[in-house]
Curated annotation (Swiss-Prot):
<keyword id="KW-0862">Zinc</keyword>
<dbReference type="Pfam" id="PF02718">
    <property type="entry name" value="Herpes_UL31"/>
</dbReference>
<keyword id="KW-1048">Host nucleus</keyword>
<feature type="zinc finger region" description="CCCH-type">
    <location>
        <begin position="106"/>
        <end position="225"/>
    </location>
</feature>
<keyword id="KW-0479">Metal-binding</keyword>
<dbReference type="GO" id="GO:0046765">
    <property type="term" value="P:viral budding from nuclear membrane"/>
</dbReference>
<keyword id="KW-1043">Host membrane</keyword>
<keyword id="KW-0472">Membrane</keyword>
<comment type="similarity">
    <text>Belongs to the herpesviridae NEC1 protein family.</text>
</comment>
<dbReference type="GO" id="GO:0008270">
    <property type="term" value="F:zinc ion binding"/>
</dbReference>
<comment type="function">
    <text>Plays an essential role in virion nuclear egress, the first step of virion release from infected cell. Within the host nucleus, NEC1 interacts with the newly formed capsid through the vertexes and directs it to the inner nuclear membrane by associating with NEC2. Induces the budding of the capsid at the inner nuclear membrane as well as its envelopment into the perinuclear space.</text>
</comment>
<dbReference type="GO" id="GO:0016020">
    <property type="term" value="C:membrane"/>
</dbReference>
<dbReference type="GO" id="GO:0044201">
    <property type="term" value="C:host cell nuclear inner membrane"/>
</dbReference>
<comment type="subunit">
    <text>Forms a heterohexameric complex with NEC2. Interacts with capsid vertex specific component 2/CVC2; this interaction directs the capsid to the host inner nuclear membrane to initiate budding.</text>
</comment>
<feature type="region of interest" description="Disordered">
    <location>
        <begin position="1"/>
        <end position="49"/>
    </location>
</feature>
<dbReference type="GO" id="GO:0046802">
    <property type="term" value="P:exit of virus from host cell nucleus by nuclear egress"/>
</dbReference>
<keyword id="KW-0597">Phosphoprotein</keyword>
Length: 306
């Protein structure tokens, strides 16, 4: 008869029996823990999973960036080798002065936020690159002088003056002469027309600080995007003016006004307001456009200009 009781004295388990038992226990526990971890990770909401992944990536590269920070020369070499910017957008607050932008900056305004972008990495800027006309300062001056020959193209600009004259019972020709005395306002209108902008409306208000008139560029819809080339051309064409983006009653507006009491540049020829006024009488302004301007003026009468 053989003794089969393993607990009796003198009987010992094999040399690998305990190890196999411990291994089986640990594998079972590890397998269960892995399942629990995977299950708990899947049960997290999407934003929490994304945050967890970002934290993991940050921890992964923390040592690399800490080492680079100790050697500035290598840090600069790494940054110069990057072909894609590390930061593509920067949030801003309104009112925002476009003088704070740098070359290649675009501006996006929407209900989701306001931020500066990099034109080379902006899909909206890349999509609109082909729609820009030649709007150098020389070309703008030429368009200003020859506007009487293309007056119908500027009906949105002139219709606003007609509505403004009616609201204040002012002579239209005198108002037109005052606006033409600030060619930069016409430059902004021409740049917007040639820059693929989404047909903005133009309002004129007296400037209580520096005299003359301010221009409110009203963007339709619930969002606006200013192409980086458009920003650069406006700032270049109007060196004595300030451009401030703002919002009023859910409508985005770009305020254009003088920086100081500065006379008009002597290199810009004068344009006869009487000739433009006579030519305007041949234009039949759309009734819907005139009603829209009346509504916009009523909306922005209480707007405090920045």
């Amino acid at each position: 008869m053989y003794d089969t009781d393993p607990h009796r004295r003198g009987s010992r388990p094999g040399p690998y029996h305990g190890k196999e038992r411990r291994r089986s226990r640990s594998s079972a526990a590890g397998g269960t823990l892995g399942v629990v971890r995977r299950a708990s990770r899947k049960s997290l909401p999407p934003h929490a999973r994304k945050q967890e992944l970002c934290l993991h990536e940050r921890q992964r590269y923390r040592g690399l960036f800490a080492a680079l920070a100790q050697t500035p020369s290598e840090e600069i070499a790494i940054v110069r080798s990057l072909s894609v910017p590390l930061v593509k957008t920067t949030p801003v607050s309104l009112p925002f002065c476009l003088d704070q932008t740098v070359a290649d900056n675009c501006l996006t305004l929407s209900g989701m936020g306001y931020y500066l972008g990099i034109g080379g990495c902006c899909p909206a800027c890349n999509a609109g690159d082909g729609r820009f006309a030649a709007t150098s300062r020389e070309a703008l001056i030429l368009a200003f002088v020859q506007q009487i020959n293309t007056i119908f193209e500027h009906r949105a600009f002139l219709a606003s003056l007609v509505v403004l004259a009616d609201r204040h019972n002012a002579p239209l020709q005198d108002l037109l002469a005052g606006i033409l005395g600030q060619p930069e306002l016409f430059f902004v209108h021409t740049i917007l027309r040639g820059g693929g902008a989404c047909d903005p409306r133009l309002l004129f208000y007296p400037d209580p600080t520096y005299g003359g008139h301010m221009l409110y560029v009203i963007f339709p819809g619930t969002s606006a995007h200013l192409h980086y080339r458009l920003i650069d051309r406006m700032l270049t064409a109007c060196p004595g003016y300030r451009f401030v983006a703002h919002v009023w009653q859910s409508t985005f507006v770009l305020v254009v006004r003088r920086n100081a009491e500065k006379p008009t540049d002597a290199e810009i020829p004068t344009v006869s307001a009487a000739d433009i006024y006579c030519k305007m009488r041949d234009i039949s302004f759309d009734g819907g456009l005139m009603l829209e301007y009346q509504r916009l003026y009523a909306t922005f009468d209480e707007f405090p200009p920045p």
